[in-house]
Every structure is written in C-alpha cells, then in structure tokens.
C-alpha cells in the first residue's frame, strides 16, 4: 500500500490548498476532487475529522495563554472558538479582552468582545459568546 500511495502522490502532486486542476476543476491535497459541479466534496466523516483536527490545534494555541487553564469549560470554549474563527494572530489583537480575562473580570472581557469589528461581522455569535464569557455558562 505504501508503494501505491507513493506512486499516486508522485503522479498527482501534493497541494495544501484548493486549486484548479488541468481541466479547471477544484481539487485539493493529492488530486482530491472537491468541485461541486462533478459531485466532489467531503464526506461527513472527513468534515468531522477536519473539525476535530482544527479544534485540537486551537486548544493547543489556547493553552499558551497563562490564564487559560484557570477558566471553566464554557469560557475555555469561547476562547477556542475565537481562535478557530479568527486565527491566533487576529485573536491576539483582542488585548483588552485578554487582559480582562487574565484578571478574572469577565464582564469587561465580554464588553470588549462586543466592542470589536469581529462582533459586527458575526452578529448573534458574538452575543452568544460574550454571554458565555460573562456568565461562565453554556448558552
């Protein structure tokens, strides 16, 4: 099987982002057709795998903040979700919110979350996540 994998990888190439193949169809990875026009896409299992992998990465990023371990599960979920949605570089721009979280001032952290471009862009998601940060409860 490893020889087969090696051969297919060599023939197809490996591309870590979506691209158009030689016939103009959206493809990713090792020749994986994702173009909807031809029935391409991902299975539910593949979607779940990708999500779990992304959450694992965001969890590891969240654990780099000294204050993260002291948060309860709903507040940790808010931070992980923000990292998932924004990416770490953009989440690191939430300095006032992060400082408030570190100080245990969750009301201010929630206010700072809502006072952002992100909140204007995502609407109800921001309201829900700010409420979770404020209360420490699942919503």
Model-derived regions: residue spans:
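Long, amphipathic alpha-helical surface segments
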Residues: 1-17, 23, 32-37, 42-55, ...
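Active-site nucleophile-His-acid catalytic modules used for acyl/amide transfer and hydrolysis
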Residues: 57-83, 87-91
